[in-house]
């Protein structure tokens, strides 16, 4: 039993040992198999990675080669295109050159043909002139032949008549012929003497005028219609214009002067044909720039102030001019009226300076001729006084000036000089003739007057006069070189519904009465202002 048990135990032990041994071998085999598998997988991975890298290298090489081929092909294409373009441009250039040469040849041929045509025309004219000259000469020769034939007939008849005359009849005939010849000679001598006297008198008159001009030596030239005001800097232009243009509109409406603001640095131009308005505008603009306060109320205040200042200056101008020509006892009212001529031009010539110049010339000429030089200067000074108020009073400046001289009891010679200096009435004194000559001399001096400027000013003045003729018009200003007429009306006389009608009527009258280039803008302004003061 124990043996069986021991045997069984031994068998069990053997089985256990065998199992353990087999298990160990099996585990070892499994681990070996797993290691082999891992190695195989690792090798496969390495091979795949190597294959992928080689494939990438091959792909990159292929792409690089492809890009290289593309670039080479593109460069070749560009080179071919460039060569083709150069060939085409060269061909076009050659064709253009040929066209230019052809055009030049055609131009030269045309010029040559024109010259030939001109030459032919000139030759034709010359031939016509020669033919006309030949015809005239032939006609003259024919006439002379006829005259000679007639003279021969007369001589034959005269000889026949003389042959039949007695001694007394022949003597009477000779005396008559001699008397006729002497009469012709005397008439010729008289004409020569008259011509000599005329030449000597002309020379004396010229000598007197030359002496007068040398002693006066006037340097005044034609005035312009613009004034310039210098600005401290360009920023002032914006302040002058004001918000939405209120300042510049107010300034132009109150002064009647165009304000021109352009690209000229630090300058504003004031343009207008009326020198008084332009001077008021200049003084106002300079005062605004100096004061720095630029707004509609301040503009209105300064315009009114400068109008009063101009009135005072007008009197000063008249007094200074009267003293300059030696007439200090002139009536004060006449001095003030003469002062207004400082702001009046005639054909661009300042009328006050013209009057002073005429006075001095008349004084010099009168002195040379032994006349009253003081009275001549006075008459010359006052000869154009009517121009100071001819825009306010009906009549010519000659008529107005004559009435003023009579009103202020001037010397009758002065009155007649004013009335006759344009030939409206007959001159009654030597002084009147002297002043007329001095007036013509001053006006005809080179640079003294400008016909085109006077025509321009007259057109603007006529434009304003047409507007002022309508009832209810307060004042009017011709602006923009006559391209616009701006009309201010009395608000109590012209209502809003009448403004358009007034503009239409003014436009119609301008079209019927004036000749002008382009268009004229008619602007009617009705302003109703209410002012009160809080106390």
Swiss-Prot record:
A Pfam family that the UniProt record links to this protein: KH_1
Record has Transmembrane helix as a keyword: yes
Compartments where found: Cell membrane
Entries under Gene3D superfamilies matching the protein: Hypothetical protein af1432, K Homology domain, type 1
Domain KH positions: 225-285
Keywords for this protein: Cell membrane, Endonuclease, Hydrolase, Membrane, Nuclease, RNA-binding, Transmembrane, Transmembrane helix
GO cellular component, one term: plasma membrane
GO biological process per UniProt: mRNA catabolic process
Region (Disordered): 99-126
Annotated membrane topology: Single-pass membrane protein
Enzyme Commission number(s) of this protein: 3.1.-.-
Regions that span the bilayer: 3-23
Function: Endoribonuclease that initiates mRNA decay.
Family membership: Belongs to the RNase Y family.
Cited NCBIfam families: HDIG (TIGR00277), PRK00106.1 (NF000997), RNase_Y (TIGR03319)
Protein's name according to its UniProt entry: Ribonuclease Y
């Amino acid at each position: 039993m124990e043996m069986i048990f021991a045997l069984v135990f031994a068998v069990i032990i053997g089985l256990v040992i065998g199992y353990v041994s087999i298990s160990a071998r099996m585990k070892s085999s499994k681990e070996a198999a797993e290691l082999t598998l891992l190695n195989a997988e690792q090798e496969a991975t390495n091979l795949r990675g190597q294959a992928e890298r080689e494939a990438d290298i091959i792909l990159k090489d292929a792409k690089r080669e492809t890009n290289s081929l593309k670039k080479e092909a593109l460069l070749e294409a560009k080179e071919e295109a460039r060569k083709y373009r150069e060939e085409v441009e060269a061909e076009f250039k050659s064709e253009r050159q040929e066209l230019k040469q052809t055009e030049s040849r055609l131009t030269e041929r045309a010029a040559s043909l024109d010259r030939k045509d001109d030459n032919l025309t000139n030759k034709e004219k010359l031939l016509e002139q020669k033919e006309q000259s030949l015809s005239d000469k032939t006609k003259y020769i024919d006439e002379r032949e006829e005259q000679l034939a007639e003279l021969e007939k007369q001589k034959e008849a005269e000889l026949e008549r003389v042959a039949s005359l007695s001694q007394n009849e022949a003597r009477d005939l000779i005396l008559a012929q001699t008397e006729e010849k002497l009469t012709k000679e005397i008439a010729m001598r008289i004409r020569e003497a008259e011509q000599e006297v005329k030449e000597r008198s002309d020379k004396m008159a010229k000598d007197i005028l030359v002496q007068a001009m040398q002693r006066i030596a006037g340097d005044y030239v034609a005035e312009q219609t613009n004034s310039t005001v210098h600005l401290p800097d360009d920023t002032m232009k914006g302040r002058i214009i004001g918000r939405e243009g209120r300042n510049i509109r107010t300034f132009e409406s109150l002064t009647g002067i165009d304000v021109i603001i352009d690209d000229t640095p630090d300058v504003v131009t004031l343009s207008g044909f009326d020198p008084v308005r332009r001077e008021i505008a200049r003084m106002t603009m300079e005062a605004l720039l100096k004061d720095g306060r630029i707004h509609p109320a301040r503009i209105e205040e300064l315009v009114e102030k400068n109008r009063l200042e101009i009135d005072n200056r007008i009197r000063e101008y008249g007094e200074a001019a009267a003293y300059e020509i030696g007439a200090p006892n002139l009536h004060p009212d006449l001095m003030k009226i003469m002062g207004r001529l400082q702001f009046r031009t005639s054909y661009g010539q300042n009328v006050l300076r013209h009057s002073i110049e005429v006075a001095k010339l008349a004084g010099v000429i009168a002195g040379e001729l032994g006349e009253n030089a003081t009275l001549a200067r006075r008459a010359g000074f006052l000869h154009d006084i009517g121009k100071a108020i001819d825009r306010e009073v009906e009549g010519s400046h000659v008529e107005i000036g004559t009435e003023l001289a009579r009103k202020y009891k001037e010397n009758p010679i002065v009155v007649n000089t004013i009335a006759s200096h344009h030939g409206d009435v007959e001159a009654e004194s030597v002084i009147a003739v002297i002043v007329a000559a001095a007036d013509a001399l001053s006006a005809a001096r080179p640079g003294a007057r400008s016909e085109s400027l006077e025509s321009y000013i007259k057109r603007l003045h006529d434009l304003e006069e047409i507007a002022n003729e309508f009832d209810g018009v307060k004042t009017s200003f011709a602006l923009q070189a006559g391209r616009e007429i701006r009309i201010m009306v009395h608000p109590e006389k012209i209502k809003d519904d009448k403004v358009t009608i007034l503009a239409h009527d003014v436009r119609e009258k301008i079209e019927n009465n004036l000749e002008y280039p382009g268009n004229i803008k008619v602007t009617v302004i009705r302003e109703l202002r209410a002012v009160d003061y809080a106390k």
